[in-house]
Amino acid sequence: MNTDAQSTSNTRNFMYSPDSSLEVVIITNSDGDHDGYLELTAAAKVMSPFLSNGSSAVWTNAAPSHKLIKNNKNYIHVFGLFKYLSNYNLNNKKRPKEYYTLKSIISDLLMGAQGKVFDPLCEVKTQLCAIQESLNEAISILNVHSNDAAANPPAPDINKLQELIQDLQSEYNKKITFTTDTILENLKNIKDLMCLNK
């Protein structure tokens, strides 16, 4: 168990989400060789979706060489984090946000510095860009459909069908008129016959 670093070490805070600042210790052994440790309670919180038997097991199950105690705080080495991420089922398409946070933490601890500093407005900007992109696509699709409708008159087949329907309607109206006239004439004849019989 490491109680103090034999090389250069410093405690830093890495930002990964709007409400979480994670305390880390970076030990620089030589140029390009770093050992990164994450504070235990932060590690347990980030890894909670991957833990089956609770957060206390993180410290208990860590190898002695993966433990660091500094300023009365417990830290776990980046290799100890790998163990939990390696057990995650990658076939699960709906991944918790902690999955991505843990991957970023592991990457940053291996490099010895935070690679991509969290921008609190980044997610909002990304969502606004996605909304704007969707709106632009919808507008362009509507414009294409509108231009197609204005530029393309109805197809000749549709015009022929419309003429046929109008002809059939006209013919039907004539037949109805003829039938109605015939019925009225027959009624008049029946009435006349009835009047004559009286």
UniProtKB/Swiss-Prot annotation:
Top-level taxon in the UniProt lineage: Viruses
Gene Ontology CC, one term: host cell nucleus
Pfam families per the UniProt record, alphabetical: Baculo_p24
UniProt subcellular location: Virion; Host cytoplasm; Host nucleus
Keywords: Capsid protein, Host cytoplasm, Host nucleus, Late protein, Virion
Additional note from the record: Expressed late in infection.
Family per similarity comment: Belongs to the baculoviridae p24 family.
The protein's name: Capsid protein p24
Organism the protein comes from: Autographa californica nuclear polyhedrosis virus
